[in-house]
Regions:
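Metal-dependent nuclease catalytic cores that hydrolyze phosphodiester bonds in DNA/RNA
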Residues: 1-106, 113-126, 137, 158-167, ...
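Metal-dependent nuclease catalytic regions and adjoining charged, substrate-binding loops involved
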Residues: 1-7, 135-283
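Residue-level recognition of conserved beta-strand positions in structured domain cores
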Residues: 108-111, 150
Length: 283
C-alpha cells in the first residue's frame, strides 16, 4: 500500500499512517474474517498497487494512540498477545488488546462514533470478540466475558443533555458473556469463512463473488414524503408506486433518495479492481 500526501500534511502525520500491516500469505486475522471475501482477496493481490491518501487515514492515528496508551498501563493482564491457530490449510490469527487471566476477560479498546452506540450496532464487535475467545480457547486458556471499551470521538455534551437516546458520557462499555454455544457457532463460521477464502483465492478477480449487502454497508433507495421547510421526511416509502399513492398537500412533495453502498463508495481501498464496483460505474 502506498500512502500519498495530496494536501501536503506534516510528514509526521504521513509517517504515522504508513504503518498499516498486511496479512502474511496463508494467514487471516480476526478482523480480516469480518470483511467480505472479495475485499480480502483483492486487497491481498493488489496490496502494492493500492493508493491511500494520508488525509483519509487520520482516524487510524486515534485508534493506534488509544491502544498504545492502554498497553502501557501496568496491571495483571496480558497485553497485545498474539494467538494463531491452524484452520484448513491456513492460519487464523488475532492480537488481543488485553486478557485478564485471573478473571478470564478479554478487553478491547475502540474508538467509535456516537451513531454506533445509538444504533446499538455491535454485531461486528461481538463476532470479533468471539473469534478472539475461540483463539484463546484453542491455545489452552478460557474466556468468560468480552468487554469492549469505546471512546466516542464525536461525542457532544449538548446533545447528551438534550437527547434522550444520546450516550451521556464519551465512553461506552459493551460486554457479553461467552458461552459454549457461542464458541461452537463461531468455530463453524471461522472454518466456513477460511475455506471460502481459500477457494476465492483460486479465482480470477472478475470471478470473485461480490461482498454481501451487509459487508458493503448498503442502504436501499427510498422515496421520501417531504414538506417544504422541514428537513426530515414525514414518511419513507420503499417503492415509487407506494409513494405515488400519497395525497400531497400544497407544500408537500416526493423526494427520491437513491440507495448506496457506503463502504464501496467511500472506504474500500480495492474498489477499482472489484467486479461489482466496475459494473456499477459502467451503468
Amino acid at each position: 500500500m502506498k500512502v500519498t500526501n495530496i494536501y501536503n500534511l506534516p510528514q509526521a502525520l504521513v509517517d504515522a499512517v504508513t504503518t498499516e500491516k498486511h496479512n502474511k500469505d496463508g494467514e487471516y486475522s480476526a478482523t480480516t474474517l469480518l470483511k467480505g471475501e472479495c475485499e480480502t482477496i483483492l486487497t491481498k493481490r493488489h496490496w502494492n498497487e493500492i493508493l491511500v491518501d494520508a488525509s483519509e487515514s487520520i482516524w487510524q492515528i486515534f485508534g493506534t494512540a488509544t491502544h498504545a496508551i492502554f498497553e502501557a498501563q501496568k496491571d495483571n493482564t496480558f497485553k497485545e498477545e498474539f494467538f494463531s491457530v491452524d484452520v484448513s490449510n491456513s492460519k487464523v490469527t488475532g492480537r488481543v488488546d488485553s486478557y485478564d487471566l485471573e478473571n478470564e476477560i478479554i478487553v478491547d479498546w475502540k474508538t467509535a462514533s456516537v451513531r454506533k452506540v445509538i444504533k446499538q450496532n455491535f454485531a461486528d464487535w461481538k463476532r470479533q470478540g468471539l473469534i478472539y475467545s475461540w483463539l484463546i480457547k484453542k491455545c489452552g486458556l478460557n474466556v468468560k466475558k468480552c468487554r469492549f471499551i469505546a471512546l466516542l470521538k464525536d461525542h457532544s455534551k449538548a446533545d447528551a443533555r438534550n437527547k434522550a437516546d444520546y450516550p451521556k458520557q464519551p465512553v461506552y462499555v459493551y460486554e457479553f458473556d461467552v458461552t459454549a454455544e457461542d464458541l461452537a457457532e463461531i468455530e463453524t463460521f471461522i472454518e466456513a469463512r477460511v475455506k471460502a477464502l481459500e477457494f476465492a483465492d483460486t479465482l480470477k478477480d472478475e470471478e470473485l463473488t461480490p461482498c454481501s449487502k451487509e459487508e458493503r454497508w448498503t442502504t436501499p433507495e427510498k422515496w421520501a414524503h417531504m414538506k417544504e421547510g422541514r428537513k426530515s421526511a414525514i414518511k419513507l416509502y420503499d417503492s415509487e408506486e407506494e409513494a405515488a399513492k400519497v395525497e400531497l398537500k400544497k407544500d408537500e412533495y416526493i423526494e427520491h433518495r437513491p440507495g448506496e453502498n457506503k463502504k464501496c463508495d467511500n472506504y474500500c481501498n480495492c474498489r477499482e479492481w472489484c467486479p461489482l464496483f466496475k459494473k456499477e460505474v459502467e451503468c
